Amino acid sequence: MILDYAFNYSKRTLSVTYINESGGKKILNFNVNKFKSYFSTPTGSYLNWDGSRCDVKWVDNPHAFDIRTYMEEMNEKYKKLLQGKTVPRLYTFDIETEISDEFPEPSEAKFPITTISIASPECNVIVLGTKDLGENGVENLQERFEKYLNSSNFFTGLNIQMPYIKYIKFNNEHDMLKYFLEQIVAKVPVLAGWNSIMFDWQYIQNRVRGYYSDISLSSSSMNRTMTQKRYADMRGNEITLNIPNHTLILDMMDVVGNFDMVVMPIKESLSLDYIASESIGMNKIKYDGDLQKLFETDYSTYVFYNAIDSILVQLIDKRFKTLQNIYTQALYCKEKIGACFSKIALTNALFFNYFYDHGVKVIPKKQEDVERGTLIGAYVRTPTPGKHDLVCCNDFASLYPSSIITCNLSIENLVGTFYDEKALIPFKEDKANYIVVGGAVYKNKGTLAKPQLGEFVSYYLLEDELDKYRRNPKYFVSVNGSVYKNDKTYSFKDIQATLKANRNTGKYLAKQLEAVVMTDVDHIIADKAINNVPYAENLVNAMKNIGYNVHCPMDLCNLMDEGLINKFKADLQKEIEYNTSFEQAMKLLGNSMYGGSSHVAFFWFNMALANDITGEARNIIHTMENHIPEYLRENWIDLKDLHKSLGIKVDVNKAKSILKETGDFVKIVYGDTDSLYISYKGLLDSLEGSETMSMEDKTKFIVGLNTGYLDEHNREFMKQYYASRHVDSVQNFELETVALSGAWLDVKKRYAQILLWKDGKTYDIGNLPMKIKGLEMVKSSYPKAAREGLKRLVRYLLEDQTDSFILQRLNIKMMEEKSIFFKAELEDICGNVGVQNYTKYIISDTDPICLKVAPKTPYNVRALGNYNWIRNVNNLPGDPLYGGKVKWYCYYPGGKKHKKKQEPEYFAFQSRNYPKWADQYAPVSREDMFTRTVLDPFNRIMEAIGIGTLKSDGSIQMGLF
């Protein structure tokens, strides 16, 4: 696995670091005077990716692809080193600084760094410091350390040896920083912390620059080279930091916040204490007073506090395992790990690798300023607002990758676009009212300055020219009017098809190794009987890849006799974990390639291709949106064999009555990107005895109809549809969920459902899960108490029968929720929000009269400004805050007596760090918070359903009749 590579132009040295078998890093240095590159020439000996001819040239200044070519053509012994599956050892760190009356700004680094803790993958901790721990200091630390770890179910469940804690005292800060940079940073492969780049690393860098000029920052790199990278801080200011080459420095807060969608989909805060508490059940160390006082009066606890921060980050990585997917993508793409957080870098790598493997060259080009143009987004149907019963979600499996594969869309086979430019002229000139994208015209629902894509008007294409290509099977014509060669499989299709196949292989292999081989290993270790059935070829090959010649369980017994079974088990577990992450990595790569290819930084960027991928995806979902209701409308009554197989009978009179009244048996309620939400109530009502059918029977009917008939029918229909366009369909449009009922608002991507069935599982009728999208109850920005209350209210609404008394019943429930909300902990009723651009909007937070803000200051920035202003003018304790994720609430300056005379103000504070003085200076208004976060969102759902609204005081306005 490649950790990093960098070319030193002055020394003409290409340095490549890789992860060795122990998870450490090794460096390879190659003296390269000139790199092989390619240039365009009609008499060239080689084929360029676009079909033109090219030839070799040797260059001093290599393009990124020239470096990749060099690495591809290395000696095999070096290439083998770069292809190892071992993941890097992750070390975590944290710094503490002295604190005076002001916040230790990392950009200034005025205060000394007091301690630095480093945790290893085994959770061993070293703390660097400049004070004596005192007698028995390390022993006492070890005792507290073990007690802390043993109190965690997550840690004890890891079954690792009890780690140690070690303390190293330095004579001064200078020596401590020198040791940290040279002996820690330069030697570890990956170093991560929490907010570690914008605070810890920036602070260390500026501390060294400002106070210790004899320490070279380049000593933090194993070959003493650095790379400059640009970041934006919480105030919106751009900063440039030097990052060592060959040590990957990560911010685990960023990794968890941006790349985890599984372990914690909802994150109210990105504070270390919150994430650790919610994910691994562990907390930062609590202490009385402030941290500076702790440093001065209880240094042992101060060191312990610092050590635990590093341990928490280490354990969070073990819980989330987000980096495993990044590592696997890096290995598959033959790219350095740090680049694999970028979809664009991954997509470039996949295309380059494909062309290289097929003997096709890539002529480097300079990055040009390209106007991106307008990318048409995914199809989202305007919902039919209201409450709908028995709604199915049918969705496409991997819609965008499948569209690329089906339609053979790629970068090198695009012939051209055939737009009727003459017909488009009046629309292009009328930018206030229209937006032109390729050959498509849309209404502009925005303004001239800020256009916004509105209703589709029409395509304006050169149909006569396109028809020639439509009749020729060697071409594919997109719905947008682009023409692609279709005489063979092209790169994008081939890459996506390979990723899809690899995903299935990795998924199956991981499950088989776990279920078959690992089970046999456990039985042998436990001295249980085993069946000596030979293993399948794929399992034998997998074990051969990790160095074992195992063909059957008896070979495992031989390993037991040789004392190697435990080593084999550990190696097998690593292989299972690799294949599990491999399956996920293939999925992520397949889905991210479309996003990467639609960005101007993509080497082969072409907006026509990006829009064709989206356009074909939109087209097929539109096609199914029309086909399913039409097919059932025309055929349902006559599908006698299907009725028999489902064990039902259709009441023909009822069926005809339904068609006459509604026009269809099924109704499309909503469409979203790759899914259609279809109500089957009309179809059910057409059955004999539908009035007495149980919910279990209704679910069984809908599931049977889809999985036993419609899924395959849809597949066959799409095959025929695409065959008429000269391509082979790999699309699958299948049943995903069946819902008891659901509520849709009159805006896109806002709904809630109660599920009866999902992906083959029928839920117990007394314990039905909810599926919610876009509503406040699943938004991490909403208070915890509000989310929980809204879920209970919406569940009651969806499960209850709509009748003339529903408003009264809901009112009772609402008042119960209000009582619960008013008793909740303060932090649980506060919203969560990120704050940026503080200095852009806050003119002064020290003015003695009031907070000075710029016009149109966002409420969240104002809330944080109020925190700083109240603290500053009243000389109150606490650190200044200028950005990041915070909690917020409404309050009335001057108290409740001023409530009727003014709008509420906003106040913000850090999660789990509420300042007690706010009780006096900014007391929360629970009434306002309840109205804003519970009552108003629930009323919006009730309005969509058409049953009126509720009031905070519990009163109901009833009609006269």
Label the predicted regions:
Residues G129-I266, Y274:
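Conserved DEDDh/DEDDy metal-dependent 3′-5′ exonuclease domain
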